Amino acid sequence: MTDAVRSAYRERAGEYTEALGSLSAMAEGDRNLIAGWARDVDGPTIDAGCGPGHWTKFLHDHGVAVEGIDMVSEFIDGAAARFPEVPFRVATLEALPADDAALAGILSWYSLIHTPPADVPALLTEFARCIRSEGTLLLGFFEAGQIEAFGHAVVTAYYWPVPLMQDELAAAGFEIVETHTRVDPGQRPHAAIIARRRSWIR
């Protein structure tokens, strides 16, 4: 699935960036949520699956020591050209470029939506590996009453019920801090969860 997602986004990276690669295209509630989360992040942070890099730039402008990563080289090249003051690199969510417990936070903003549901726990475990005790993850995704595939404009994506995603986060080593949902007219339901890494020492 990773290769299929990479290929689909490589073909449409320019189109995607033009349509969704700016903060003006983002919901005000999302900007406020991410800005509030950023105020509490104190240390190295990764924007995991950064796409065009606009959220990475947003975090950088809010004082976060952030690096954007994406497996699509076209996104990374474009982001680096648009935001030269912000670090970006090609990397995968399966193997984040961070040592154990090295990060204060990870933003995963709709970057898991194309992941087959059976593979999501492994990615959350990888996030947990990288986040230090009391560090946080902000996860955005499409919400529904059951796990269900749908025809995303780029490539197949998946809805997740909030309670099931909370359970997966808990199993990976996180405690739920906040949960947010919203339904915009004519749009798919959205959800976001802020989760704190449980102590590495038990």
Give residue spans per PLM region:
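Acceptor-substrate binding/catalytic loop of class I
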Residues: 148-164
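A short SAM/SAH-binding and catalytic strip from SAM-dependent methyltransferases
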Residues: 104-118
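Core SAM-dependent methyltransferase catalytic element
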Residues: 182-202
